[in-house]
UniProtKB/Swiss-Prot annotation:
Its main location: cytoplasm. This is D-alanine--D-alanine ligase. Mg(2+) 2 binds at residues 300, 302. Mg(2+) 1 binds at residues 287, 300. The gene is ddl. Residues 131-333 form the ATP-grasp domain. GO terms for molecular function: ATP binding; D-alanine-D-alanine ligase activity; metal ion binding. It catalyses: 2 D-alanine + ATP = D-alanyl-D-alanine + ADP + phosphate + H(+). Signal peptide: none annotated. It comes from Streptococcus pneumoniae serotype 2 (strain D39 / NCTC 7466). Pfam families: Dala_Dala_lig_C, Dala_Dala_lig_N. Coiled coil: none annotated.
Length: 347
């Protein structure tokens, strides 16, 4: 009997379009000799829509439902995703997706799911909290100033100008896929950047700009996590924002990255240490800055990285000899393993 994968995609965050791209790639890569795929779309309004089921590979003309093609007659209660023995693959990016909220819902339903648990998902989603945890683990971070809604913005800008030097990067603390990020060369640009970032979150991070290469390491496993050789994001733009990443195609990837063996070893060790520090499970992608001075800074942990066939995470594992279909199989097996352990802890 084939294993059922419940593919959850869409969502309420600004990254919902990325989620659709990732989910379509997963549904095409699945080994249909082993799996059946049932898909549920989460609309921008947060409604659950039962969409397609696939017992064999979809055709090129098959497309997943989006906010533009919703069939409201297929709206269901969120709990309708439950199926005994099924494993949920929440291909959801950003808030209300990889921030622990959906993970908590799935644990209430008592369903195995791919990826990090409630704690590690919510922790890694918040950039400020992640930085503080990783600092405690001895992992170097780019200098930063945290700003929370209600703070005296003028005083915080003065703190930024005292502790950091322009250019600086302003980021919503609780957002992914480079959404809401701005580069500022002066105080006026910083004020505008803060306004933009506060549109997406009530907690904002201002980081020192560094002249650095962007290097990424893939992580796979539960308590025996393994890492990939690093890959490099090669940009034709000033910084790696949402449009450059997903719309303008101004980014290429160099896998493996052309860096020394010593740097590779440090990055892989730091990535694995960071994953354990947040209590990670299943998968993550760890992003580093490697400066022209030879400094290595851990930028962030992404607990549900982009999963399209051209995304860095699956390509990193392909370079390690694990194909996209095999990667999905391993993630499903890891989900069942962590579910069994979680259930065993409930006495």
């Amino acid at each position: 009997m084939k294993q059922t994968i419940i593919l959850l995609y869409g969502g309420r965050s600004a990254e919902r379009e990325v989620s659709v791209l990732s989910a379509e790639s997963v549904m095409r890569a699945v080994d249909y000799d082993r799996f059946t795929v049932k898909t549920f779309f989460i609309s921008q309004s947060g409604d659950f829509i039962k969409t397609q089921e696939f017992s064999h590979a979809p055709g090129q003309e098959d497309r997943l439902m989006t906010n533009e093609t919703i069939d409201w007659d297929k709206k269901v209660a969120p709990s309708a995703i439950y199926e005994e023995g099924a494993v949920v693959f929440p291909v959801l990016h950003g808030p209300m997706g990889e921030d622990g909220s959906v993970q908590g819902f799935l644990e209430v339903l008592k369903m195995p799911y791919v990826g990090c648990n409630i704690l590690s998902s919510s922790l890694a989603m918040d950039k400020i909290t992640t930085k503080r945890v990783l600092e405690s683990a001895g992992i170097a971070q780019v200098p930063y100033v945290a700003i929370v809604e209600g703070d005296d913005v003028t005083a915080k800008i003065a703190e930024v100008e005292e502790k950091l030097a322009y250019p600086v990067f302003t980021k919503p603390s609780n957002m992914g896929s480079s959404v809401g990020i701005s580069k500022s060369e002066n105080q006026e640009e910083l004020r505008q950047a803060l306004k933009l970032a506060f549109r997406y979150d009530s907690r904002v991070l201002v980081e020192q700009g560094v002249n650095a290469r962007e290097i990424e390491v893939g992580l796979l496993g539960n308590y025996d996590v393994k890492s990939t050789l690093p890959g490099e994001v090669v940009k034709d733009v000033a910084f790696y924002d949402y449009d450059a990443k997903y719309i303008d195609n101004k980014v290429t990837m160099d896998i493996p990255a052309k860096i020394s063996d010593d740097v590779v070893a440090v990055m892989r060790q730091n990535a694995e240490t960071a994953f354990r520090a947040i209590g990670g499970l299943g998968l993550s992608r760890c992003d580093f800055f490697y400066t022209d001075k030879g400094e290595i800074f851990l930028n962030e942990l992404n607990t549900m990285p982009g999963f399209t066939q051209w995304s860095m995470y699956p390509l990193l594992w392909e370079n390690m000899g694990i194909s996209y279909p095999e990667l999905i199989e391993r993630l499903v097996d890891l989900a069942k393993e962590s579910f069994d352990k979680r259930e065993a802890h409930l006495i």
